[in-house]
């Protein structure tokens, strides 16, 4: 099935605008890829799951379009466990060995981990070089590749070391979703559902109606979901690129979810720990339950969200073995907190997310205890 090309410009105050392009076959478009390299050096950063499928093709496309390019490659182990300061150091070393100058470009070929790591390396090398995001997972296409957040994890918490570094471009080749494992597809759908939950009730309803097509990987349904999700994120990011206010709404479920990920030691291919999308799914349900407990919303909306996530084969309960006290301790390190007080994204029902400062820890503990 041939999908229409979709593009969306993100215009940020005081920052170079960039375009999100969504279509099949984009990784073979060497002229488009190489057109974003201002100098002669490019680093292609990918992971052990994605590189065997696409890295050689991207390298060939770049060199066919620009034979003068010096293209370095770095392949990291797949999974959140690679998003570390050590792996970040490997990316910096790769740039140094390439002889990359300030007009170099880093290409992030992979999912959210690769995008975060490559973006952070680009932000730091010589105080900032270009980064082009080439997302290959649904989660990266609809969330992490858009907006310029880059980071690595440390044992104390997720994404605590990072920078805002908007990409030069986001080029999402939807053909890459054909090789995406079903679990990773579902993880991406959790972030898609988030957009309906925070600001688009009609999209929430559409997702319910199209759930079977989306789970089956129907190309047309996925293209529509990706485009709608990117529209929502781009609109918010353009108004609040540095997350001083409204952009925090995009974190519905993330404070709870990040606590789960950190306490489990982060997910990795082949283990039973929740991946990012799964943890966010659980986190959204917890946020909805807390909202109802605080009198902000009703139980009917909470159940509608839980049911939709369940229908997409996503978890909705805290995994066994995680204590409320341990999760709360992780939540205290969340970047949205102010003056040591919990600041959470909650909601007043489907499509009506809200930033709530100074949430009482006792109320959170009660929700975490179930």
UniProtKB/Swiss-Prot annotation:
Record GO cellular component, one term: cytoplasm
Family annotation (InterPro entries): Dehydroquinate_synthase, DHQ_synth_AroB, DHQ_synth_fam, DHQS/DOIS_N, DHQS_C
Subcellular location: Cytoplasm
Gene3D superfamilies per UniProt: 3.40.50.1970, Dehydroquinate synthase-like - alpha domain
One Gene Ontology biological process: chorismate biosynthetic process
Residues holding NAD(+): 112-116, 136-137, 149, 158, 176-179
Enzyme Commission code(s) on record: 4.2.3.4
Alphabetized Pfam families for the sequence: DHQ_synthase, DHQS_C
Co-factor binding comment: Binds 1 divalent metal cation per subunit. Can use either Co(2+) or Zn(2+).
Residues that bind Zn(2+): 191, 254, 276
Alphabetized GO MF terms: 3-dehydroquinate synthase activity; metal ion binding; nucleotide binding
The keyword Lyase is annotated on this UniProt entry: yes
UniProt keyword list: Amino-acid biosynthesis, Aromatic amino acid biosynthesis, Cobalt, Cytoplasm, Lyase, Metal-binding, NAD, Nucleotide-binding, Zinc
Top-rank taxon, per record: Bacteria
Primary location: cytoplasm
Pathway field: Metabolic intermediate biosynthesis; chorismate biosynthesis; chorismate from D-erythrose 4-phosphate and phosphoenolpyruvate: step 2/7
Cofactors (names): Co(2+); Zn(2+); NAD(+)
Enzyme class: lyase
Reactions listed under catalytic activity: 7-phospho-2-dehydro-3-deoxy-D-arabino-heptonate = 3-dehydroquinate + phosphate
CDD domains recorded: DHQS
PANTHER family from the UniProt entry: 3-DEHYDROQUINATE SYNTHASE, 3-DEHYDROQUINATE SYNTHASE, CHLOROPLASTIC
Family designation: Belongs to the sugar phosphate cyclases superfamily. Dehydroquinate synthase family.
Described purpose of this protein according to its UniProt entry: Catalyzes the conversion of 3-deoxy-D-arabino-heptulosonate 7-phosphate (DAHP) to dehydroquinate (DHQ).
The name this protein goes by in its record: 3-dehydroquinate synthase
């Amino acid at each position: 099935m041939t999908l229409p090309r979709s593009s969306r410009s993100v215009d940020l105050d005081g920052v170079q605008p960039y375009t999100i392009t969504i279509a099949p076959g984009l990784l073979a478009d060497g002229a488009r890829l190489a057109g974003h390299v201002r100098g002669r050096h490019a680093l292609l950063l990918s992971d052990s799951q994605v590189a065997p499928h696409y890295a050689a093709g991207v390298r060939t496309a770049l060199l066919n379009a620009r034979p003068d390019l010096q293209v370095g490659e770095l392949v990291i182990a797949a999974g959140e466990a690679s998003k570390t300061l050590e792996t970040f150091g490997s990316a910096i070393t790769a740039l140094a060995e390439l002889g990359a100058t300030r007009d170099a470009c880093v290409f992030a070929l992979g999912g959210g981990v690769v995008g975060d790591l490559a973006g952070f390396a680009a932000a730091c090398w010589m105080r900032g070089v270009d980064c082009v995001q080439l997302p290959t997972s649904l989660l990266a296409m609809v969330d992490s590749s858009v907006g310029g957040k880059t980071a690595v994890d440390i044992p104390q918490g997720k994404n605590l070391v990072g920078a805002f570094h908007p990409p030069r471009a986001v080029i999402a080749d939807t053909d890459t979703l054909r090789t995406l494992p079903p679990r990773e597809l579902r993880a991406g759908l959790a972030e898609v559902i988030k957009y309906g939950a925070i600001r688009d009730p009609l999209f929430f309803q559409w997702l319910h109606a199209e759930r079977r097509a989306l789970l089956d990987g129907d190309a047309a349904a996925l293209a529509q979901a990706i485009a709608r999700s990117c529209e929502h994120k781009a609109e918010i990011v353009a108004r609040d690129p540095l997350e001083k206010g409204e952009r925090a709404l995009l974190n519905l479920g993330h404070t709870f979810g990040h606590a789960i990920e950190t306490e489990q030691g982060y997910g990795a291919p082949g283990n039973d720990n929740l991946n990012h999308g799964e943890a966010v799914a659980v986190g959204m349900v917890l946020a909805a339950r807390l909202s109802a407990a605080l009198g902000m919303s009703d139980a009917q909306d909470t159940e509608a969200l839980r049911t939709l996530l369940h229908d997409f084969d996503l978890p909705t309960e805290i995994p066994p073995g995680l204590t409320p006290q341990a999760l709360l301790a992780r939540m205290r390190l969340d970047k949205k907190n102010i003056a040591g007080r919990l600041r959470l994204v909650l909601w007043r029902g489907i499509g009506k997310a809200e930033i709530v400062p100074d949430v009482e820890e006792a109320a959170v503990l009660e929700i975490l205890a179930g």
